[in-house]
Amino acid sequence: MERKTVYIAGLGLIGASLALGIRRAHPEIEILGYNRSEESRQVALERGMVDRVTDDFAAFAPLADVIILAVPIKQTIAFIKDLAELDLKENVIISDAGSTKAEIVAAAEKYLQNKPVRFVGAHPMAGSHKTGAKAAHVTLFENAYYIFTPSSLTKPGTLEEMKDLLSGLHARFIQVDAAEHDRVTSQISHFPHILASSLMEQAAAYSQEHELTQSFAAGGFRDMTRIAESEPGMWTSILLTNPQAILERLEDFKDQLDKVAAAIEAKDETAIWEFFNRGRQSRKQMEIHKRAGVDSFYDLFIEVPDEEDAILGI
C-alpha cells in the first residue's frame, strides 16, 4: 500500500484499537488522532497508536487520505457536517464506527453529496464495558464482524481499499444495507443492553428491602448484567437513533413475558419446559459459541490463600 495519512477522530476504545490494528499491518502509514481528552491523547502517543494528536477536529482533516469517525453517533453526524465545509483531499475516504447506521449514512448523503469524497458507513462489532484509549488492544476485532454499510457515495474500489487498510484487525468483513443493520442490531445488541440495565435497576431497588440480594448476585446474574457497565452517553445516542426497531423489540419481549407469566399462573408444566427448551436449543444453534472478538475483555477471578508470598505462586 502506498504511504497514506489516516485520521482517526476519537481515541477511545474503538478508535485507539483501530489505530493499533492499522499500525500492525501498515507501519508506514501516518496516523493522526483527535480527542477532546488530554489523557486519551497522551496515552495514544505514548503507546505509539498515533504520530500526532489534536483537540481541534478540523486541524488534521484536510491532510488525510482516510478519515475514520470513531465518536458517538450524534457527534459523528456533527463532524460529517463539519467535513462538508472543509477543504478535503480529492477522493478522500470517510468512514465511521457508529453502532447505528441509517441516520449516519443519510447525513453523509445529504451533506457530502457535492464533495469529491467517498463515504462508506461501518460498524466494527466488538467492544467492552471498559472504555478509553488505555483499554485499547490490537486483538479487539479479531474474528469479529466488521460491517460495511455502503452509500451512494461509496465509489468502486472503496471497500477494497478499506479492507486492505484494516487487514491488521483480522476481522470478518461483511457488507449489509444500513436499514437491515439497524434492525438486526436492535435485537442482538441494543435490546440486550436495555435488558441488562433494567435487571440491575430492578435488583438495586429490590435489595433495599432484601439485603441478601447483592450478596447472592453472582454467576448467571453477573454474566447477564456485565454490559450494564457500558458508557451511558453512547447508549443514549444508540437508542435515540434507532427508536422504531428497538421499540418493536421491546413490544415483542413484553409479549414473551406475558406468555411465561400465563404459563406460571396456570401451572402449565409443559409450556414452561418448552419455553426453556426452546431457549436452550436456540442458544446451541447460534454462532456465538464459535466466534471470538465480540467481547474481548473478561474479568478473571483467582482464589489466593491469605498467607505470605501466596501471590508469587500465581
How does the language model describe each region?
Residues 1-62:
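NAD(P)+-binding Rossmann beta1-loop-alpha1 motif at the extreme N-terminus of oxidoreductases
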Residues 5, 30, 118, 145, ...:
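Residues at the starts of beta-strands that form the adenosine-phosphate
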Residues 58-88, 92-93, 99:
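Rossmann-like NAD(P)-binding element
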Residues 81-133:
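Rossmann-like NAD(P)(H) cofactor-binding subdomain of soluble oxidoreductases
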Residues 140-227:
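Internal alpha-helical scaffold of NAD(P)-dependent oxidoreductase catalytic cores
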Residues 209-278:
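Interdomain hinge/lid region at the active-site interface
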Residues 288-314:
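A conserved regulatory-domain signal marking ACT and ACT-like small-molecule sensing domains
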